[in-house]
Design a protein with these regions (language model features):
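Positively charged n-region of N-terminal signal peptides that target proteins for export
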Residues: 1-8
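Hydrophobic membrane-insertion alpha-helices, especially the h-region
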Residues: 8-22
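Membrane-interface motif at the C-terminal end of an N-terminal transmembrane signal
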Residues: 18-34
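Auxiliary, metal-adjacent structural segments of Zn-dependent hydrolase domains
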Residues: 44-106, 112-116
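Surface-exposed patches in mature extracellular/periplasmic domains of secreted proteins
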Residues: 84-87, 139-143, 176-183
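Post-HEXXH active-site segment of zinc metalloproteases
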Residues: 117, 121, 133-163
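Short active-site segment of divalent metal-dependent hydrolases/proteases
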Residues: 124-132
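Long, well-structured alpha-helical subdomains associated
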Residues: 157, 161, 166-185
Length: 185
C-alpha cells in the first residue's frame, strides 16, 4: 500500500492544481481575459439590447449616408473591437471579423479603392458579425434570427453570412444596437 502511495505522490500536486483551478473557473461567472471585453455575465446580459429584433428600415442606410462608416468605427472602438488594415484571413474577401472566445475580436480591412457607400456596407457587414458575437455571449457567432432566405443561406454558406449580407446596408440600425451595448467590465 505504501508503495502505491509513493508511486502516485509526484502526481498529487499537479492533480490538486488542476482540481483547484477547475473549481475556481466553475465558480466564476466570467473567464479572465486581461481586458475590458470579457464573457458576458447573466446580470450584464440583462442590460444589453435585444439583438434579435430585426431592422425596421426607419434608420439611415449606407446608400443614404455613406459617412455612417465612421460612426460604426467609433462605436466599435468604444466597445473594444480592434480594426486593422491588412489582408483579411479569408481569400477573396475585402474584410473579416475574427471573433475571440471571451472577448470582442478584430476586423481586418483590405486597403483598396471603393466607393464610400460600398466601404460603409463592408464595415457594417463586419459589425453585424460583432453583433452576432455579442448575441452569442462572446462564446460563438450566433445567428440573430433576422429574416433570411434559404437561397441566401445557400449562396453565402451560413445563416450568419446571409444575415450580414442582407442587412449590411442598414448601418443606422447596426449603430443603434452598438450604441445600446454597454462596455463590458
Amino acid at each position: 500500500r505504501q508503495i502505491m502511495i509513493r508511486s502516485f505522490w509526484p502526481l498529487l500536486i499537479p492533480f490538486s492544481v488542476v482540481l483547484i483551478g477547475s473549481w475556481r473557473l466553475s465558480t466564476e461567472s466570467t473567464i479572465p481575459t486581461g481586458g475590458p471585453q470579457q464573457v458576458i455575465s447573466r446580470r450584464e446580459k440583462q442590460r444589453f439590447p435585444d439583438y434579435t429584433f430585426p431592422p425596421s428600415g426607419n434608420l439611415a442606410t449606407c446608400q443614404q449616408d455613406p459617412s455612417l462608416d465612421d460612426a460604426l468605427l467609433r462605436e466599435g472602438s468604444r466597445l473594444g473591437v480592434r480594426v486593422i488594415a491588412g489582408q483579411p484571413e479569408l481569400a477573396k474577401k475585402d474584410a473579416t471579423y475574427r471573433a475571440e472566445h471571451g472577448r470582442l475580436g478584430t476586423i481586418t480591412l483590405k486597403q483598396r479603392s471603393m466607393s464610400p457607400a460600398v466601404r460603409c456596407m463592408l464595415i457594417s457587414h463586419e459589425f453585424i458579425h460583432v453583433l452576432q458575437h455579442l448575441h452569442g455571449d462572446l462564446k460563438g457567432v450566433d445567428s440573430l434570427g433576422w429574416q433570411t432566405t434559404p437561397e441566401g443561406v445557400q449562396r453565402f454558406g451560413s445563416i450568419q453570412e446571409a444575415e450580414a449580407y442582407r442587412y449590411q446596408n442598414r448601418a443606422g440600425y447596426v449603430i443603434h444596437l452598438l450604441r445600446q451595448t454597454p462596455v463590458s467590465q
